[in-house]
Amino acid sequence: MRYLTAGESHGPQLTTIIEGVPAGLYIEQDDINYELARRQKGHGRGRRMQIEKDQAKVLSGVRHGKTLGSPIALVVENNDWKHWTKVMGAEPITEEEESEMKRQISRPRPGHADLNGAIKYGHRDMRNVLERSSARETTVRVAAGAVAKQILAHLGIKVAGHVLEIGGVKAAHTAYESIEDLQKVTEESPVRCYDSEAGQKMMDAIDEAKKNGDSIGGIVEVIVEGMPVGVGSYVHYDRKLDSKLAGAVLSINAFKGVEFGIGFEAASKNGSEVHDEIIWDEEKGYTRKTNRLGGLEGGMSTGMPIVVRGVMKPIPTLYKPLQSVDIETKEPFSASIERSDSCAVPAASVVAEAVVAWEIANAVVEQFGLDQIDRIKENVEKMRQLQREF
């Protein structure tokens, strides 16, 4: 499977075309819109989320609630477009109109794509860069992830994301009873944190950063349960499941690090403290005593829960901006200010959940794939049976 996205932050709409989704999958627009609504929530979000009410429209690939096997086209309209029709319109304008155009940007923000993108593509108005590099694009990535989650749900695979840390405040209590329990509690938290006490401190940290015109980042975790053994490959580097998951998480705006299981802690431990001992269970077959490697060995799933974490840096748009340079005058200036969040970590956990779900679904369809969802399910069940009987 694959998908492409198109659209600018303040353009008329965002679009994604999804190819390779098997036929016969039951899906409704409400399933997608539920995920889009989750992305818009979260303490620390900016005024843009008060303007947008993201709703996906399915234009192709689905008939009477079931996928056809043909490409699925989804669009999400930008409500804010009506305020940007002249600035972001596709029609040509004169040089005089361009010189008088408001909202042109010549002072790049440190930490953003502004300057590098302007040099790469030759844009004197860096709005041409920031409109596409904006995290607004993740709206349709979440929509694509919603389709992937429906595939996984049909196969008995569950995906849940939550927040572990914001602005140095760490969740102390993360021992959830089940993945359903984790989902229920985090959906009720304004910062998507399972630990309610830590969640309140996270909100306080966000409020303090906002008051100071600053921003803060954090750490999110995504858990995948119900995986069959052997998804991925040890044969080639580009087919390793952990490689694909790491790339997906790092492709999210502002994400700068990724780890699996105990992650970077493994560097300071002995091998006996890192690797998961193999045991035989009458019901499950081969399994592990622990899950320190996060459900992945040799580029493949072990059948244990996959645990992946991503580090999100603070958003680079600051209301007390850092020093920059005006590219027209070469004089020092404060960086440009755009409407932005003070913290997007809670929303980013939903995006991380979506991209992980996509990579898992893609790997499963590739490995067990046929063109019909029920046949894929039969093959997945055969692998689960093999794990029990091998």
UniProtKB/Swiss-Prot annotation:
Q: Which InterPro entries match?
A: Chorismate_synth, Chorismate_synth_AroC_sf, Chorismate_synthase_CS
Provide a GO biological process annotation.
aromatic amino acid family biosynthetic process
Name its pathway.
Answer: Metabolic intermediate biosynthesis; chorismate biosynthesis; chorismate from D-erythrose 4-phosphate and phosphoenolpyruvate: step 7/7
Q: Tell me its EC number(s), please.
A: 4.2.3.5
Q: Which keywords are on file for this protein?
A: Amino-acid biosynthesis, Aromatic amino acid biosynthesis, FAD, Flavoprotein, FMN, Lyase, NADP
Q: Which Gene3D superfamilies match?
A: Chorismate synthase AroC (3.60.150.10)
Quote the cellular component terms of the Gene Ontology held in the record: cytosol
Do the record's keywords include 4Fe-4S?
no
Catalytic activities: 5-O-(1-carboxyvinyl)-3-phosphoshikimate = chorismate + phosphate
| Any Pfam family hit | Chorismate_synt
Query: Which residues of the sequence carry a binding annotation for FMN?
Result: 132-134, 253-254, 298, 313-317, 339
What PANTHER family does UniProt report for this protein, alphabetically? CHORISMATE SYNTHASE
Q: Which family does it belong to?
A: Belongs to the chorismate synthase family.
What does the subunit section of this Swiss-Prot or TrEMBL entry state? Homotetramer.
Q: What is this protein called?
A: Chorismate synthase
Source organism (scientific name):
Bacillus pumilus (strain SAFR-032)
Q: What is the lineage of its organism?
A: Bacteria, Bacillati, Bacillota, Bacilli, Bacillales
